[in-house]
Amino acid sequence: EILRTVYQEEESAGKCRKLAGEIEDGIKRYGITELPPFGKIYAYETDGLGNYVFMDDANCPSLLSLPYLEYCTAEDEVYKNTRAYILSEENPCYFSGSVIKGVGSPHTKKGNVWPIGIIMQALTSGDAEEIKECIDMLLASHAGTDYMHESINADDPEDYTRSWFAWANSLFAELLIRVKELGIYDAGGKGQ
């Protein structure tokens, strides 16, 4: 759109649209596969020869973030199946502890959950209770710093990486603005 509307570069815009179509076709042809008991899901990686990696990483973009990125809707059947997989113990990057649960990353130690993953879970949810649970976990896990961290030990919020992670803080602010607009969460006027 920018190439076409701002720079009037129709030829370049056409090449980009063609490439986008080829990528979309590749995702549909090679990136969706059956994974019992979840059904058809998006693979995290594929070689196009029938080999797949099943997982999701808490970063954005991620499979969990697909509706946030407007690739599909949260009601898309393949996405719903993929989301169920991502937020389950079957995902090797999903961790559940006594303080928080959610998606982590191979980039940080096993057992650490990323606030970005919890925030993305809330941003892509239509369930007010799930959103509230996500916010409550985030509020319970900042270790008294009032900042979102890169990752947090699911059992010990004092054990975290990056004391101040602007990416997570920015997404958390976006989440709070959205839930305020929707009127689905009240932190009780505690300034949290």
Predicted regions and their residues:
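Extended ligand-binding clefts on enzyme/binding-domain cores
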Residues: 5-117, 124-126
